[in-house]
A protein has these predicted regions:
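P-loop NTP-binding module
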Residues: 1-297
Length: 297
């Protein structure tokens, strides 16, 4: 039995078994990958402030796979996103309360959560009737904002700190159709308190309600590293925990899950897992370059 299966078994034993016919809140989604960019052109030109999505720069940062891995990993992300979308929009199952607010976290740094956040966003925006807002919720280490070159732009913390600031003014379109980005914003010594505030709840409710077909994906700080991530978990409707295969210990996975509400769906995503389905070896979450860069923080 794997480390992840052991963690889930212990957690389910402590929290009670799942009722017959009910989907467990603690699914193992055993893969990560990337989606290919849409081939068709946008119906209209992108806005002037649209954030450029430089694939070469993102690959160099370890946040996109190399071209030769795209097809295999794209298929894996299709498997990952489906239950997330179904819970968010109530497709084939009752919608999860605030299920379109999805937090992507890890127990500790180096698991690949930022890689997961970006590539899940790119895959999900390919849906015909779904748009995506990717939020840099790692206000301690806003790597996504830095890589996209918007680390100095007002963002999440600013709009929570200043109620007079329009939410729409800090949501930035990107050059990728169907994908927008909300930077982390300017750092704050009381970031945890801001994320746990009533104002934060108001902000995420507005983000969730503006477009019923929008998924809001939060790239969060590691759960066991900061208190900011635990505050962010309070407003998310569903949570994905990225676990690096062969490295993350069982007790860390279990400890991370224990910080979360029992009432929210929590899924584990096994990252950098080598499998051999249909004769292929897949390695998830790695840049794939010689020497193997980590897939993000």
């Amino acid at each position: 039995m794997s480390v992840i299966e052991n963690a889930i078994k212990r957690l389910q034993a402590s929290r009670g078994a799942t009722a017959p016919g009910q989907e467990s809140a603690f699914d193992v989604l055993a893969s990560v990958g990337s989606a290919r960019r849409r081939d068709t052109a946008a119906d209209s030109a992108p806005p002037a402030r649209a954030i450029p999505i430089n694939q070469d720069a993102l690959r160099a940062a370890g946040l996109l796979p190399p071209p030769h891995q795209e097809r295999e990993l794209a298929q894996q992300y299709r498997q990952i996103k489906r239950p997330v979308i179904n819970r968010a929009l109530g497709r084939g199952m009752p919608a999860v309360p605030q299920g379109n607010l999805v937090m992507i976290a890890s127990a500790v740094p180096g698991e690949g959560k930022t890689f997961m956040s970006l590539n899940l966003a790119l895959s999900t925006r390919l849906e015909e009737d779904v748009t995506v807002l990717l939020v840099d919720g790692d206000v301690v280490n806003p790597r996504m904002s830095q890589v996209l070159g918007v680390q100095d732009e007002p963002g999440l913390l600013d709009v929570v700190r200043d109620p007079s600031l329009s939410i729409a003014s800090v949501v930035l379109p990107t050059e990728v159709p169907g994908l927008a980005f909300l930077p982390a914003g300017r750092p704050s010594d009381n970031a945890t308190e801001l994320l746990a505030s009533v104002r934060m709840h108001q902000v995420v409710v507005q983000l969730a309600s503006e477009d019923p077909a929008r998924l809001v994906l939060f790239d969060s700080a590691p759960l066991l590293l900061t208190t900011e991530s635990q505050a962010l978990a309070q407003v998310a409707g569903q949570i994905l925990i990225v676990v690096r295969a062969g490295q993350t210990s069982q007790h860390l996975v279990f400890e991370a899950i224990e910080t979360l509400s029992e009432e929210k769906p929590v899924s584990l995503v096994l990252n950098q897992c080598v499998r051999q389905p249909h004769g292929y070896y897949y390695q998830y979450g790695s840049s794939g370059a010689a020497g193997g860069k980590p897939s993000g923080t």
